[in-house]
Amino acid sequence: MKREPISKEIQYQVFCRDNWHCRYCNDPVFFSPILKIFESISPGHEYYHPNGKSGKMIPLFANKFASVDHITPVTKGGENNLDNYVTSCWECNLKYGNKTHEAGKPQPNTIISSMNLKWDGLSSLYTKLLDKNDKWSDIINNS
């Protein structure tokens, strides 16, 4: 099976399902497009780099922006579907990469209960700070 691009709709669905927390380390994650807006509002503060490059972003943002990870990598027989996707901070995504559970990748933690949890990865700010609507804002506004 070939790894397919994960649509923005599916990414946002996974982030919301997992309550904007990394399923490996349980840390809250940031919605990376908001970091681009922060950088445009206050240039030179290293809030954002197009490739999330280490040393070019504030470590907190570089390590903890939200990404979707395959629990079982496609190259190891995993599928491209919601059951095989979890929210991962960029740090964990890089650390576990193409590993399987047998090779040291942990099983994803249980989804943190959303009860009394108001964290949204700063995604709600995205629609408020954006100059004009885009695909992400449409997804956020319609969810």
Tell me what each language-model feature is.
Residues 1-35, 124-143:
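A boundary/linker detector
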Residues 27-30, 85-108:
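Short Cys/His-centered divalent metal-binding micro-motifs
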Residues 29-85:
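Histidine-centered nuclease catalytic patch
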Residues 50-68, 73-74, 114-142:
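Short Fe-S-cluster ligation motifs
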Residues 20-21, 67, 88:
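The −1 position to Zn-ligating cysteines in a subset of zinc-ribbon hairpins
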Residues 44, 50-53, 94-103, 114-119:
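Short, surface-exposed, polar/charged, turn-prone segments marking secondary-structure boundaries
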Residues 18-20, 109-117:
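Short, low-complexity, intrinsically disordered N-terminal segments
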